[in-house]
Regions:
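Conserved active-site and SAM-binding loop architecture
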Residues: 1-313
Length: 313
């Protein structure tokens, strides 16, 4: 299979193709982040890097590409972002993906993005000519990660639930003061900046109140993590009960971030997949990346002609 990957990141698409049993004849990638490129060059030396999608004339690939894959930057659509939709320069990169499809005319395509307002979803669908399928990564990993997938690969269905929970992927990491929290279960939480009055009530519109970083525990269900992002404090573990706990850092509240190895497991990539780049870059790349087993599941519906011949193994 001849593959064109836009906004390639850490090349999760290549790994997913391998897991789906797809024979890769060529893999051309467009990515500008240096650490992501370094990871790809180490893990997949066959990948040809091309740089910035906005500077490419994709007509050179016309008739030469079987599959275009990509996840155009989602911050403009995300509920955790400012939701600027198509006015956000990052979201406008979606149209580079559309341009690539028009210019190289692949047989198949796959685009991933966040769950968004229906009006924006419909705009993307109108350009791609298909409706998306929504898949939560929780079916194949220990992470809640709802995403939309637009593809013309036929007959894609939801993956079976692998029943993977956090206890299956967490390392044995001790808190600084285990005696103080002995016997308590870990709850998933976030650290959020809030403006609180003297009674601890939210007054977010009152700019005279300083922002305090609150550890917020909203549920005791720890079967799945929150969705990974590029911000560590969006996703933490704590033994504290449900509620809002102010001054998380100042009061040295007991919590910990997911380790990079745990984040790899949440995105279903090998533990050592990003050992060659700085830890901070690896964590950001994982927050931006694909859940590989979801992508592999979708790609498994490609026609058998693209799959590795195992008869001679």
């Amino acid at each position: 299979m001849r593959v064109l990957s836009l906004f390639d990141g850490i090349c999760c698409g290549h790994l997913a193709l391998e897991r789906a049993g797809i024979k890769i004849d060529s893999y051309d990638a467009y990515e500008i982040e240096k650490n992501a490129i370094k990871a790809t060059e180490t893990n997949f030396p066959d990948v040809i890097q091309h740089g910035d999608v906005t500077k490419e004339d994709f007509t050179k690939y016309k008739g030469k590409i079987d599959l275009i894959i990509g996840r155009s930057p989602c911050q403009g659509f995300s509920s955790s972002g400012k939701q600027l939709n198509f006015n956000d320069p990052r979201s406008k990169l979606f149209f580079e993906y559309v341009r690539a499809i028009k210019e190289c005319q692949p047989k198949y395509f796959l685009l991933e993005n966040v769950v968004m307002k229906k009006e924006w979803q419909d705009i993307i669908s109108s350009y791609l000519g298909v409706e998306p399928i929504e898949i939560n990564s929780s079916l194949v990993s220990a992470q809640n990660r709802r995403r939309l997938y637009w593809t013309n690969i036929p007959n894609v269905t939801l993956p079976e639930d692998k029943n993977i929970t956090l206890k299956d992927i967490l390392e044995d990491i001790k808190f600084p003061n285990p005696a103080a929290i002995r016997g308590r279960r870990l709850n998933k939480a976030t650290i959020v900046g809030r403006r609180l009055d003297e009674n601890g009530h939210r007054k977010d519109t009152d700019k005279t109140i300083p922002i305090t970083q609150c550890l917020e525990v909203r549920a005791t269900n720890t079967d799945k993590s929150n969705c990974l992002t590029t911000v560590d404090k969006d996703n933490v573990l704590t033994p504290l009960p449900i509620g809002r706990h102010p001054d998380a850092f100042k009061n040295n509240l007991p919590f910990r971030y997911y380790t990079t190895k745990e984040m790899c497991r949440l995105q279903t990539v090998p533990d050592d997949f990003l050992n060659m780049i700085p830890d901070s870059a690896a964590r950001k790349a994982l927050g931006n990346g694909w859940t590989v087993d979801v992508i592999a599941h979708i790609l498994s519906f490609l026609p058998n002609e693209y799959k590795e011949d195992k008869t001679n193994d």
